[in-house]
Amino acid sequence: MPLRPGRCYRKFSGPAYTRREYIPGIPMPKITKFVMGNVNGDYDYELRLITTEKGQIRHNALEAARVIALKYLSKKLASEQNFALVVTKYPHHVIRENKMMAFAGADRLQDGMRLSFGKPIGTAARLEKLGELVMYVRVKKEHLEAAKEALKIASSKLPIRTKIEISALNKEAAAQ
Protein backbone atom coordinates (compact mmCIF):
# COMPACT_ATOMS: atom_id res chain seq x y z
CA MET A 1 0.00 0.00 0.00
CA PRO A 2 1.21 3.55 -0.67
CA LEU A 3 2.28 5.99 2.02
CA ARG A 4 -0.57 7.94 3.58
CA PRO A 5 -0.43 11.76 3.44
CA GLY A 6 1.28 13.60 6.29
CA ARG A 7 -2.02 15.16 7.42
CA CYS A 8 -3.08 11.71 8.68
CA TYR A 9 -0.37 11.82 11.36
CA ARG A 10 -0.08 15.56 12.08
CA LYS A 11 -2.24 15.55 15.22
CA PHE A 12 -1.71 13.22 18.16
CA SER A 13 -3.61 12.02 21.19
CA GLY A 14 -2.57 9.78 24.03
CA PRO A 15 0.91 8.90 25.23
CA ALA A 16 3.86 8.40 22.92
CA TYR A 17 4.44 4.86 21.68
CA THR A 18 8.23 4.59 22.01
CA ARG A 19 9.19 1.34 23.76
CA ARG A 20 11.18 -0.30 20.96
CA GLU A 21 11.97 -3.40 23.00
CA TYR A 22 8.27 -4.35 22.94
CA ILE A 23 7.53 -3.44 19.31
CA PRO A 24 8.63 -5.85 16.58
CA GLY A 25 9.32 -4.66 13.04
CA ILE A 26 9.86 -0.91 13.40
CA PRO A 27 11.31 0.53 10.18
CA MET A 28 14.48 2.59 10.60
CA PRO A 29 14.01 6.39 10.37
CA LYS A 30 14.98 7.90 7.01
CA ILE A 31 16.81 10.73 8.74
CA THR A 32 20.27 9.60 9.86
CA LYS A 33 22.41 12.77 9.81
CA PHE A 34 21.50 15.50 12.26
CA VAL A 35 24.62 17.74 12.15
CA MET A 36 25.93 19.11 8.84
CA GLY A 37 28.48 21.71 7.86
CA ASN A 38 31.17 23.22 10.07
CA VAL A 39 29.78 23.34 13.62
CA ASN A 40 33.03 24.69 15.09
CA GLY A 41 33.14 27.77 12.84
CA ASP A 42 32.92 31.39 13.96
CA TYR A 43 29.45 32.66 13.00
CA ASP A 44 27.55 35.92 13.45
CA TYR A 45 23.92 34.78 13.35
CA GLU A 46 21.79 31.82 14.33
CA LEU A 47 18.49 31.25 12.50
CA ARG A 48 16.02 28.92 14.21
CA LEU A 49 13.04 27.12 12.72
CA ILE A 50 10.46 27.14 15.54
CA THR A 51 6.99 25.59 15.64
CA THR A 52 3.89 27.73 16.10
CA GLU A 53 1.56 24.80 16.76
CA LYS A 54 1.65 21.35 18.36
CA GLY A 55 1.90 18.24 16.22
CA GLN A 56 3.98 15.39 14.86
CA ILE A 57 6.57 15.44 12.10
CA ARG A 58 7.18 12.12 10.36
CA HIS A 59 10.73 10.94 9.79
CA ASN A 60 10.49 11.33 6.02
CA ALA A 61 9.32 14.96 6.37
CA LEU A 62 12.28 15.71 8.68
CA GLU A 63 14.63 14.13 6.14
CA ALA A 64 13.06 16.07 3.25
CA ALA A 65 13.45 19.36 5.15
CA ARG A 66 17.07 18.55 6.05
CA VAL A 67 17.99 17.56 2.48
CA ILE A 68 16.45 20.62 0.83
CA ALA A 69 18.01 23.04 3.35
CA LEU A 70 21.44 21.42 2.98
CA LYS A 71 21.19 21.40 -0.82
CA TYR A 72 20.18 25.07 -0.98
CA LEU A 73 22.87 26.21 1.46
CA SER A 74 25.59 24.15 -0.25
CA LYS A 75 24.65 25.64 -3.62
CA LYS A 76 24.36 29.26 -2.47
CA LEU A 77 27.33 29.36 -0.07
CA ALA A 78 29.67 27.27 -2.30
CA SER A 79 31.06 25.24 0.60
CA GLU A 80 29.88 23.35 3.67
CA GLN A 81 32.52 25.23 5.68
CA ASN A 82 30.42 28.43 5.55
CA PHE A 83 27.47 27.25 7.66
CA ALA A 84 26.32 24.82 10.34
CA LEU A 85 22.94 23.10 9.99
CA VAL A 86 21.62 21.07 12.95
CA VAL A 87 18.33 19.14 13.17
CA THR A 88 17.36 19.03 16.85
CA LYS A 89 14.37 16.66 16.82
CA TYR A 90 14.61 12.86 16.67
CA PRO A 91 11.62 10.70 15.60
CA HIS A 92 11.06 8.52 18.69
CA HIS A 93 7.29 7.93 18.42
CA VAL A 94 6.30 4.78 16.49
CA ILE A 95 3.38 5.28 14.08
CA ARG A 96 0.96 2.40 13.50
CA GLU A 97 -1.48 1.80 10.67
CA ASN A 98 -4.49 -0.52 10.54
CA LYS A 99 -4.42 -1.26 6.83
CA MET A 100 -7.80 -1.08 5.11
CA MET A 101 -8.50 -2.33 1.60
CA ALA A 102 -10.79 -0.39 -0.71
CA PHE A 103 -11.73 -2.62 -3.63
CA ALA A 104 -14.55 -4.97 -4.56
CA GLY A 105 -14.68 -8.00 -2.29
CA ALA A 106 -12.38 -6.45 0.33
CA ASP A 107 -14.95 -7.07 3.05
CA ARG A 108 -14.27 -10.81 2.76
CA LEU A 109 -10.51 -10.30 3.22
CA GLN A 110 -10.23 -7.85 6.09
CA ASP A 111 -11.45 -7.68 9.67
CA GLY A 112 -12.60 -4.06 9.83
CA MET A 113 -12.15 -2.68 13.34
CA ARG A 114 -11.67 -6.10 14.92
CA LEU A 115 -8.01 -6.46 16.04
CA SER A 116 -7.42 -2.89 14.89
CA PHE A 117 -4.18 -2.06 16.77
CA GLY A 118 -2.14 -1.74 13.59
CA LYS A 119 1.39 -2.52 12.46
CA PRO A 120 4.34 -0.12 12.76
CA ILE A 121 4.88 1.81 9.53
CA GLY A 122 7.32 4.53 10.60
CA THR A 123 8.41 6.99 13.25
CA ALA A 124 7.63 10.61 14.09
CA ALA A 125 8.97 13.43 16.24
CA ARG A 126 6.40 14.79 18.68
CA LEU A 127 6.31 18.55 19.25
CA GLU A 128 4.20 18.91 22.38
CA LYS A 129 4.89 22.58 23.19
CA LEU A 130 4.58 25.75 21.19
CA GLY A 131 7.89 27.27 20.18
CA GLU A 132 9.92 24.05 20.03
CA LEU A 133 13.11 24.15 17.99
CA VAL A 134 13.10 21.88 14.92
CA MET A 135 16.40 22.90 13.29
CA TYR A 136 18.85 25.79 13.26
CA VAL A 137 21.44 27.27 10.92
CA ARG A 138 24.50 29.32 11.90
CA VAL A 139 26.01 31.67 9.30
CA LYS A 140 28.09 34.78 8.86
CA LYS A 141 26.41 38.14 8.19
CA GLU A 142 26.89 38.04 4.40
CA HIS A 143 25.05 34.70 4.14
CA LEU A 144 22.04 35.69 6.26
CA GLU A 145 19.55 36.00 3.36
CA ALA A 146 20.51 32.62 1.89
CA ALA A 147 20.03 30.95 5.28
CA LYS A 148 16.59 32.60 5.66
CA GLU A 149 15.54 31.28 2.27
CA ALA A 150 16.87 27.79 3.06
CA LEU A 151 14.80 27.58 6.26
CA LYS A 152 11.75 28.96 4.45
CA ILE A 153 12.03 26.20 1.84
CA ALA A 154 12.64 23.58 4.56
CA SER A 155 9.54 24.71 6.46
CA SER A 156 7.41 24.00 3.39
CA LYS A 157 8.32 20.31 3.74
CA LEU A 158 6.98 20.11 7.31
CA PRO A 159 3.32 19.34 8.13
CA ILE A 160 2.98 22.00 10.85
CA ARG A 161 3.35 25.77 10.77
CA THR A 162 6.71 27.22 11.72
CA LYS A 163 8.44 30.57 11.99
CA ILE A 164 12.05 31.69 11.57
CA GLU A 165 13.72 33.43 14.50
CA ILE A 166 17.04 35.26 14.04
CA SER A 167 19.47 35.95 16.86
CA ALA A 168 22.94 37.47 16.87
CA LEU A 169 25.70 35.30 18.29
CA ASN A 170 28.30 38.00 18.96
CA LYS A 171 28.20 41.60 20.16
CA GLU A 172 29.31 43.19 16.85
CA ALA A 173 26.44 41.56 14.95
CA ALA A 174 23.96 42.56 17.66
CA ALA A 175 25.05 46.20 17.49
CA GLN A 176 24.31 46.47 13.74
UniProtKB/Swiss-Prot annotation:
GO terms for molecular function: structural constituent of ribosome. GO terms for cellular component: ribonucleoprotein complex; ribosome. It comes from the Archaea. GO terms for biological process: translation. It holds the Pfam family Ribosomal_L16. Keywords: Ribonucleoprotein, Ribosomal protein. Gene3D superfamilies: Ribosomal protein L10e/L16. Belongs to the universal ribosomal protein uL16 family. HAMAP family: Ribosomal_uL16_arch (MF_00448). This is Large ribosomal subunit protein uL16. It comes from Sulfolobus acidocaldarius (strain ATCC 33909 / DSM 639 / JCM 8929 / NBRC 15157 / NCIMB 11770).
